């Protein structure tokens, strides 16, 4: 294959990936917000959660964002309908994620960072809650857009699976970050990789 064709193939693949991975949509409209709120009410989301989510939707930028989650697992987890016998907290979360992972990956949403707690919280200010310094895990989850997140949360399949997450978690804090930036953005990494491949192919053809 000639270098020109190699560059063309790489360019087509990259443009396709960039177009899928990047949010080009406008911010959510008031009509969309009302529609998602109605869907959340229909699938049984708590009123206080819906109110918080409404505010998040109304401040939509149209861009991608991440949610920072810190989690303290419940051991043993609560027993709910459909839970595996003698399951631990991680097994309950895995059952919850059986729906979430396909829904996330199909929308270019994915974990950016996952880590286990190395110690209790080292710095707490303005917080006086018992055991607030005890956490098991931190997760940074990237979402392509708020519209994608709402499509997942308003899916009736999510409501049924959410019980497994509630059963497995003692306490959690989750808050969104937007704007945000990471040096390991897959669009940047893939662009650099394709440049290396393209120039390496050119060098091989010259030799």
Outline where the language-model segments fall.
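Charged/polar, solvent-exposed surface patches and flexible loops
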Residues: 102, 106, 151, 160-163, ...
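Short amphipathic alpha-helices within nucleic acid-binding modules
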Residues: 79-80, 145-161
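Short, aromatic-rich amphipathic segments at membrane interfaces
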Residues: 160-188
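Sec-exported extracytoplasmic/periplasmic mature domains
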Residues: 105-109, 144, 154-157, 170
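Short S/T/G/P-rich N-terminal loop/turn motif that feeds into the first structured element of a domain
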Residues: 2-135, 178-207
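Acidic, glycine-rich flexible loop segments
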Residues: 128, 133-142, 146, 150
């Amino acid at each position: 294959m000639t270098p020109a064709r190699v560059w063309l193939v790489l360019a087509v693949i990259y443009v396709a990936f960039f177009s899928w991975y990047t949010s080009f949509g406008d911010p959510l409209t008031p009509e969309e917000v009302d529609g998602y709120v109605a869907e959340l009410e229909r699938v049984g989301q708590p009123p206080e959660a819906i109110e918080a989510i409404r505010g998040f939707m109304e401040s939509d930028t149209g861009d991608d964002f991440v949610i920072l989650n810190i989690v303290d697992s419940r051991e043993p987890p609560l027993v709910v309908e459909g839970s595996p016998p003698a399951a631990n907290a991680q097994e309950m979360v895995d059952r919850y994620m059986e729906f979430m992972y396909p829904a996330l990956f199909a929308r270019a949403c994915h974990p950016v960072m996952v880590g286990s707690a190395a110690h209790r919280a080292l710095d707490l200010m303005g917080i006086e809650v018992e055991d607030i310094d005890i956490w098991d895990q931190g997760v940074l989850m990237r979402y392509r857009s708020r519209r994608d997140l709402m499509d997942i949360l308003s899916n009736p399949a999510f409501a049924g699976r959410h019980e497994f997450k509630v059963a497995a978690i003692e306490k959690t804090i989750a808050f969104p970050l937007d704007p945000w930036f990471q040096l390991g953005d897959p669009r940047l990494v893939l662009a650099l990789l394709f440049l290396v491949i393209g120039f390496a192919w050119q060098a091989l053809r010259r030799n």
